[in-house]
């Protein structure tokens, strides 16, 4: 199926799973296609037919944004370069969980988590070592006896009982011998959280910013915001202080800017943030949805960030309460 068809199916599935969704992003650049929230779970979702089409640069941006939004990234695909994605298996692409749409359905609608993850060499299962040891001892099976039945060394069985992962073939044989499940389910959300610290973004780094971005975002930094510049997202930065986050756009006033401001408003509704667009030159509307439009010259008149929040309130631009 085409990527667009797959994306539409993913969106329909997430609606069915009672997620609140942002608009579908058709703005370039885009490191994700849609944002989705259900309760405290916020997903940044990217859809690719071939998950190996995900570049390292885009993956890094998606991971950084997920940390900033307190969310989790996920890629939905159909295949790698070599083979289709297996149902019930989780693949990793630069630290981001990747699954097919059937696995997504099982996880969020049927509440059946995957049990298998892909790694170099094949498909693996995380063994519940304590359960394995308890079952073995309850059945009076020695390490040597279990090792012989499985065709591995005693040391390998000891490692399984200490939490070492096993191939899917070994895990299935262990469950057959012990007549009980020993595999731990794979939680795709927790899987990212375990490595999220590696994606911690650095604030106030404008080395790759354009001159217009440096001027506008530099003003936000001057009045007290931490600014996280983006290069692959459908907005220019995420700005924050101790109390709030703002999805931030920077542009001349034009039709493309209005389209981006509209998407940012829908994203803010889902992410539970403010949305601000700093515009160079004259503009007519004061807001697009919940995205405040402000002239760069007007922003320079502010003494501190409280002036900006006062303006947000006076123009009745709301911060979404998603997930609260």
Swiss-Prot record:
SMART domains: HTH_XRE
Domain HTH cro/C1-type: 132-189
DNA-binding region: 143-162
Cystine crosslinks: none
Keywords tagged on the record: DNA-binding, Transcription, Transcription regulation
GO molecular function: DNA binding; DNA-binding transcription factor activity
Entries under HAMAP family matching the protein: HTH_type_cro_C1
Protein name: Putative HTH-type transcriptional regulatory protein UNCMA_15260
Species of origin: Methanocella arvoryzae (strain DSM 22066 / NBRC 105507 / MRE50)
Source lineage: Archaea, Methanobacteriati, Methanobacteriota, Stenosarchaea group, Methanomicrobia
């Amino acid at each position: 199926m085409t990527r667009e068809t797959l994306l539409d199916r993913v969106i329909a599935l997430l609606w069915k799973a009672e997620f609140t969704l942002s608009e579908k992003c058709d703005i370039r650049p885009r490191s994700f296609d849609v944002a989705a929230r259900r309760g405290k779970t916020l997903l940044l979702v990217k859809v690719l037919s071939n998950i190996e089409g995900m570049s390292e640069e885009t993956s890094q941006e998606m991971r950084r944004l997920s940390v900033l939004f307190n969310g989790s990234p996920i890629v939905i695909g159909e295949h790698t370069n070599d083979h289709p994605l297996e149902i019930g298996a989780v693949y990793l692409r630069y630290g981001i969980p990747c699954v097919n749409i059937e696995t997504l359905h099982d996880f969020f609608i049927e509440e059946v988590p995957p049990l298998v993850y892909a790694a170099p060499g094949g498909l693996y299962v995380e063994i519940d070592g304590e359960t394995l040891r308890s079952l073995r001892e309850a059945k009076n099976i020695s390490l040597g006896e279990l090792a012989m039945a499985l065709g591995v060394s005693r040391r390998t069985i000891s490692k399984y009982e200490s939490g070492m992962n096993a191939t899917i073939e070994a895990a299935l044989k262990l469950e057959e011998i012990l007549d009980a499940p020993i595999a731990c389910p794979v939680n795709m959300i927790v899987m990212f959280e375990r490595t999220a610290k590696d994606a911690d973004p650095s604030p106030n780094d404008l080395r790759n910013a354009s001159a217009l971005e440096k001027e506008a975002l530099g003003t936000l930094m001057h009045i007290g915001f931490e600014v996280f510049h983006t290069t692959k997202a459908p907005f220019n930065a995420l700005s924050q202080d101790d109390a709030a986050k703002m999805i931030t756009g920077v542009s001349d006033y034009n039709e493309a800017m209005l389209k981006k401001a509209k998407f940012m408003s829908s994203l803010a509704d889902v992410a539970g943030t403010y949305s601000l667009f700093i515009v160079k030159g004259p503009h007519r509307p004061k807001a697009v949805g919940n995205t405040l439009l402000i002239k760069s010259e007007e922003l320079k008149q502010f003494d501190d960030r409280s002036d900006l929040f006062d303006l947000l309130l006076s123009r009745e631009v709301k911060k979404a309460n998603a997930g609260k």
